[in-house]
Amino acid sequence: MPRPKKWRKVCCLPESNLFGPLTPHYRDREIIMMTVEEYEAVRLIDLEGMNQEECAEKMNVARTTAQRIYNDAKKKIADALVNGKIIKIEGGDYKLCSDSEPMYECGGCRRHSCGT
């Protein structure tokens, strides 16, 4: 019997889910798939300035899981930057924190704090 899925908590979806080179033949480029929880780990650690422990707490996962998710995301970003590939963000095992969730539970990201 497989283990039940543990949903990762994500504050908000990216405003755009496709990133890559702006060349005329960009559609011919290889696409790297990044999950929403990988995007969230990068957002929390690199943009919000959290450490892995704080990121893990926000995402409702173990620190080792947050570290693995973050490292996977960094490898994908580096591959896309160095090799001119496209990153597409979609899928994963996540649940969005809702706007109705109390702020003490969500903590609120910059987007929610700024009302965007």
UniProtKB/Swiss-Prot annotation:
SUPFAM superfamilies: Sigma3 and sigma4 domains of RNA polymerase sigma factors
InterPro entries xref list: RNA_pol_sigma_r3/r4-like, UPF0251, WH-like_DNA-bd_sf
Annotated HAMAP family: UPF0251 (MF_00674)
Family per similarity comment: Belongs to the UPF0251 family.
Protein name: UPF0251 protein Amet_1463
UniProt organism field: Alkaliphilus metalliredigens (strain QYMF)
